[in-house]
Amino acid sequence: MNAPTTVADSVTVPVSLGDRSYDILIGKGLVERAGEEVAKRLKGVRVAIVTDENVAAVHLERLQASFARAGIDSTPVIVAPGEKSKSFATLETVTNAILAAKLERGDAVVALGGGVVGDLSGFVAGIVRRGMNFVQMPTSLLAQVDSSVGGKTGINTAHGKNLVGVFNQPQLVLADTQVLDTLSPREFRAGYAEVAKYGLIDRPDFFAWLEANWQEVFSGGAARTKAIAESCRSKAAVVARDERETGDRALLNLGHTFGHALESATGYDSSRLVHGEGVAIGMALAYRFSARMNLAGIEAAERVEAHLKAVGLPVSLAEVPGGLPPAEKLMDYIAQDKKVTRGTLTFILTHGIGQSFIAKDVPPAAVLEFLKERLAIA
């Protein structure tokens, strides 16, 4: 596993993918340093900065000034905030804006925003002129520790989440920890679900550290930077082994099969459920289901739920506002999960804290019965 290195006020985590390797820089002040860092790696480029209205209001001017200082011309492309921008309509709008600006294949798309902007921008960068350069500047905790690393990009459809997209690795990730101070408490908590996930997959020591230090992670400082760097380190190691999710990269989907089904069931309405909240409930359900299938003790599920509750995350179906459809409908959404192979269900289940594994051919009847039980409790 690649160890983070500290250089100048930032931590660097390498992602090792041969000639497509890149660095994740983590630290304060990276928005101001962005022009300098991009100019080092991509000579003579112009950039399209894809961002949403909320992020643009707070960070766009500083980023454009940084690019201007480095002699880089930038064109902003601003989209509506929220999951609904991961759509064919917005994809077309952003693509047309980049083409209208006459950006060339050797130029770059810079994603300044959370996971939605990153996923959308990466897809655009992968298909416009058959592939432009791509730089991730994640502004949410969730994006800094998860979606900005590893090259997964895409949009949603009426059939489910992330069903259309490409693998497109960035040339650079700049994770400015200072921008996290502008997040709402709810947004920060949602991102923390993905941080906890890395401990639950295969790093019980990291999960125990989070249990002891989560309050400092939330308040900022060294613990926050460490949590982000360790999360990126975990993901970078998995991506280096299995870039295209043909093997154990699927472990990173712990909690996501249930979570994506809940997001679909709530119509991607962020007032009801955001991605990280869906993942938190999904991880709690994965641990409960593992216990129900006699794969793990109930104590592990209770420990996971206790920690997620402590930080203010939901852990049950009852906590989804506005109610949920019947278990049969949730199963329809689960059947659209990208881990489904030839009609059989694949889940990330667990033998305990830090002992997750890929479970293939999970009996649909067992999942349906489990969902009925959890909905009845709701």
From Swiss-Prot:
Cofactor: Co(2+); Zn(2+); NAD(+)
Cofactor annotation comment: Binds 1 divalent metal cation per subunit. Can use either Co(2+) or Zn(2+).
Binding site for NAD(+): 115-119, 139-140, 152, 161
Organism: Brucella canis (strain ATCC 23365 / NCTC 10854 / RM-666)
SUPFAM superfamilies listed in its UniProt record: Dehydroquinate synthase-like (SSF56796)
EC numbers: 4.2.3.4
GO process annotations (BP): amino acid biosynthetic process; aromatic amino acid family biosynthetic process; chorismate biosynthetic process
GO molecular function: 3-dehydroquinate synthase activity; metal ion binding; nucleotide binding
Subcellular location as annotated: Cytoplasm
Family: Belongs to the sugar phosphate cyclases superfamily. Dehydroquinate synthase family.
Pfam families in the record: DHQ_synthase, DHQS_C
Keywords carried by this UniProt record: Amino-acid biosynthesis, Aromatic amino acid biosynthesis, Cobalt, Cytoplasm, Lyase, Metal-binding, NAD, Nucleotide-binding, Zinc
Pathway noted in the entry: Metabolic intermediate biosynthesis; chorismate biosynthesis; chorismate from D-erythrose 4-phosphate and phosphoenolpyruvate: step 2/7
Record's catalysed reaction(s): 7-phospho-2-dehydro-3-deoxy-D-arabino-heptonate = 3-dehydroquinate + phosphate
Matching CDD domains: DHQS
NCBIfam families named in the record: aroB
GO cellular component, one term: cytoplasm
PANTHER family per record: 3-DEHYDROQUINATE SYNTHASE, 3-DEHYDROQUINATE SYNTHASE, CHLOROPLASTIC
Residues involved in Zn(2+) binding: 194, 256, 275
Main location: cytoplasm
Superkingdom field: Bacteria
Function comment: Catalyzes the conversion of 3-deoxy-D-arabino-heptulosonate 7-phosphate (DAHP) to dehydroquinate (DHQ).
Name of the protein this chain belongs to: 3-dehydroquinate synthase
